[in-house]
Amino acid sequence: MTDNQRQSTTDGQPETRDPAQATAEAAEQTQATQASAAVEGELQDGSADSATGASLSADDGADPEALRQRVEELEKALADAEQKAEEHWDQVLRMRAELENARRRAEKDVDQAKRQGLEKVCGDLLQVKDSLEMGVQAAEDAEADREKLLEGSQLTLKMLNQVFERFEIEEINPQGERFNPDYHEAMAAQPSDEQEPNTVLQVVQKGYRLQDRLLRPALVVVAKKGDGGAGSGGSVDETA
């Protein structure tokens, strides 16, 4: 600053500045501020990059050997699971084959049992047939003894009853019994003052059952409430 300028300031007059100089000083100050901000930003970016790099280094360097072992463990577990699945599938296939074989054996055994049972029945009936043929031949003789023919027929019937007994074939002869629609079939109903209604008065044809299975129902005539006259017909209580 010149002596005249100092004098002016001393005298209380405002200092006058060159506009160009003021503009230059302002530009220098702005550049200095921008440079300072740029340096500070670079420092901050460098710190962030350093932190990120350190984090990545920590992740990337998180014991590669442990990661490799973990991968090997997972691969081994997967291989074991696949092996077990294959073993289980083989077991399923074997069990399926065994069940199919068992089913076939059971069917074969049932068929064989049926054939054996039928063969046994037929074998026993052959003896009855032989006896009947002998009786027929004896009856054809004009000089045949009637009593001997009767004895032969009775013997044949006895043989047949023995066959039925061996195979648990039971005769149904419900004479005088109460009508049972499960084992009897009513052919007619007759009035009766001596028997209660639905009582079997006559067995037209005997029935037979094999154990608990009905082979043939007995054909019967049942009693109904007397109406003062004889005759046939009328209804039967099928629910008796």
Swiss-Prot record:
Keyword tRNA processing tagged: no
Start-end of Basic and acidic residues biased regions: 65-89
Keywords, sorted A to Z: Chaperone, Cytoplasm, Stress response
Biased composition (Polar residues): 1-13
InterPro entries, per database record: GrpE (IPR000740), GrpE_coiled_coil (IPR013805), GrpE_head (IPR009012)
Gene Ontology MF terms in the entry: adenyl-nucleotide exchange factor activity; protein homodimerization activity; protein-folding chaperone binding; unfolded protein binding
Biological processes annotated in GO: protein folding
Keyword check for Cytoplasm: yes
Biased composition (Low complexity): 20-38
Lineage top rank: taxon: Bacteria
Protein location: Cytoplasm
Gene Ontology CC terms: cytosol
Annotated segments matching region Disordered: 1-89
Predominant localisation class: cytoplasm
Family of this protein: Belongs to the GrpE family.
Function: Participates actively in the response to hyperosmotic and heat shock by preventing the aggregation of stress-denatured proteins, in association with DnaK and GrpE. It is the nucleotide exchange factor for DnaK and may function as a thermosensor. Unfolded proteins bind initially to DnaJ; upon interaction with the DnaJ-bound protein, DnaK hydrolyzes its bound ATP, resulting in the formation of a stable complex. GrpE releases ADP from DnaK; ATP binding to DnaK triggers the release of the substrate protein, thus completing the reaction cycle.
Subunit-structure text: Homodimer.
Protein name: Protein GrpE
This protein's encoding gene: grpE
